Amino acid sequence: MGSLLFDSPVGRFVASFPALSAAAGLIVAISFIYIRFIKTPKLDLPVVGNPGDKWDAQKHIVAGARKYPDTPYILPMDPPIVVLPIKIQDEVRNLPENVVSFTKEHQRNFFAQYTGIGDHRPEMITAIRQDLTRHIVSTIPGLQEEVRYGFDKEFGDCKDWTPFPLYMKVLRIVALTSGRVFVGRPLSREEEWLQRTISYTMDCVKARNAIREYPWWKRRWVTSSLPEIAKLTEHRTRGGVLLKPIMDAQLAKDSKREKIINEETGDEEGNFIEWLLKHTPGDLKMDPENLALNQMVLAFASVHTSSMSVTHAILELVTRPEYFAPLREELEEVRRADGHTVDDDGYIRLKKESINKLRKLDSFMKESQRFNPPISTSGTRICTADLKLSTGHTLPKGTRICFPSYDVHHNPKTTTYSPEYNPPGYTPPDQFDGLRFFKLREMPGKESRHQFATANHESLVFGFGNHTCPGRFFAANQIKIILAELLMNWDVRLKGDVEQKGGPEKRPQNMVVDLVITPNPMAMVEMKRRSRAV
């Protein structure tokens, strides 16, 4: 391409002037980069929906999956994404990063080269998958204590019905409980740390949106001066200052010290900072900003998603108040059967083994999540090499791909939601049934299936494959403990719903932007302490 330009008469004229020649060379280089790395590949696939239909993406996913069940189709987003048939999950879900990449897609979405968001953090993943999951029972007492502290702090005495913005209150409680496990007290309760773990996610989105305002060729020169980028740097720097005393104390401990056993849980004592540092390579162990970045990334991945799940569940509960009684009855039955402990303030705590016995609550959480997932698709990746599919299609490098999980979770042809698979009294998947998965687990052979944290071909909210969410078991416990506290000790209703009649039509509408689903941040509820709180 370059030689053709300079072999022409115009090219020879341009070449006689160094400045023009340099400019022409730059144009050639930019054109090459655009064609090679940025231009979206053209695909001969059906297109479902119209460009700009941001609010209808969810509808188009279902329509496309049912119209084209055996072939990929395109959602004309910016950039476009190819939705793959669910039947080919197994040939894609465990492909290596040099074929399809979750990490590269996340880096693309958040402009990792400018923001640092999306860098691979193997030490964090390993600490969650190996250590946090293995020692998960040891987190339960602290979670229960912190949930009670969070409710008291955020809602106060509340002897009479008092209005609250639901999402923002839940967000702070989730951040408190997450911090209790991830950094421990007293830092987890310090307002600065709490605010940073909450705002980091929102500031990441602001930074991404700020960069998007500039054409791709200009970003390298402007991003370093953006205040949104400076804010991310501040989070990491200041986070490092706050974490350094904890890091230094942890590193100073004798690595061969005798392990302490938690008398209440029977589990080996440990903390997440210890586990994280154990897997951190080389000199990075001594870098408090690296530790801070891991903590911020952890908050990015967990705090808002768990807060959304809790908020959705509460909104479903207050608009379907018929579920209060069976969920509270289950809590009382489990508490009577297993016993309980009483903390220093006289409050009852469930036994560690009781959490997994709350099957009706687990079912309600899963059904709420089925209707209100954080995203309408799963398995989002970008092709890092040409991808040949068994459908006969070849997707070129640079193609974004996903699976239509929202349709899977609402399609009566999906085995889990088919009448043949379910017990008598089957509820079609387009209708809400808070005890759907409880009833399935009552069937012989299905006792351990269909849990909130389940990840398989037909349960895709947490992903499925080599990037399945490693923290889903912790999230399930955290959400369950928060909802159990609400059910045992609080009355809650939609603001103005004095008779507590509810009604699904009164539920504040979710916010849907492209593929992302979030609860309405303006949703208001009224709360008061139950007269027989435990």
Curated annotation (Swiss-Prot):
Keywords, in A-Z order: Glycoprotein, Heme, Iron, Membrane, Metal-binding, Monooxygenase, Oxidoreductase, Transmembrane, Transmembrane helix
Keyword Oxidoreductase: yes
Gene Ontology, cellular component aspect: membrane
Its membrane topology: Single-pass membrane protein
Pathway: Secondary metabolite biosynthesis; terpenoid biosynthesis
Regions crossing the membrane: 13-33
Protein name: Cytochrome P450 monooxygenase ascG
Compartment(s): Membrane
Top EC category: oxidoreductase
Applied value in biotechnology: Ascofuranone is a specific inhibitor of trypanosome alternative oxidase (TAO), and quickly kills African trypanosomes in vitro and cures infected mice. As an essential factor for trypanosome survival, TAO is a promising drug target due to the absence of alternative oxidases in the mammalian host.
GO molecular function: heme binding; iron ion binding; monooxygenase activity; oxidoreductase activity, acting on paired donors, with incorporation or reduction of molecular oxygen
